């Protein structure tokens, strides 16, 4: 598996209902076995974190164009991003 974690800053307090709708709309794009899951979580009222789980680095790279388009369209400021191959997964041990 391959992970992407990001932190995002909003100009206003997070609209969680709208964000759930946005994520639901992305399900059609992410309906393959290559995107395992996407999770968004609140850090504070104007900052959220994101975890994307891909089946492989290649799957992540394949999704990059669509992901970057969504990022640009969001109007949010990305504070950080980390990516990497998993090497230990508790549910697999």
Describe each model-derived feature in a short phrase:
Residues 1-49, 55-66, 76-93:
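Short S/T/G/P-rich N-terminal loop/turn motif that feeds into the first structured element of a domain
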Residues 68-72:
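Low-complexity, intrinsically disordered Gly/Pro/Thr-rich segments
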């Amino acid at each position: 598996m391959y992970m992407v974690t990001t932190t995002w800053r909003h100009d206003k307090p997070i609209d969680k209902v709208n964000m759930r709708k946005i994520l639901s709309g992305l399900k059609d794009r992410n309906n393959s076995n290559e995107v395992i899951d996407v999770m968004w979580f609140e850090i504070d009222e104007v900052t959220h974190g994101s975890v994307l789980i891909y089946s492989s680095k290649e799957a992540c790279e394949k999704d990059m164009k669509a992901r970057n388009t969504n990022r640009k369209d969001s109007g949010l400021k990305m504070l950080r991003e980390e990516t990497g191959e998993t090497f230990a997964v508790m549910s697999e041990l």
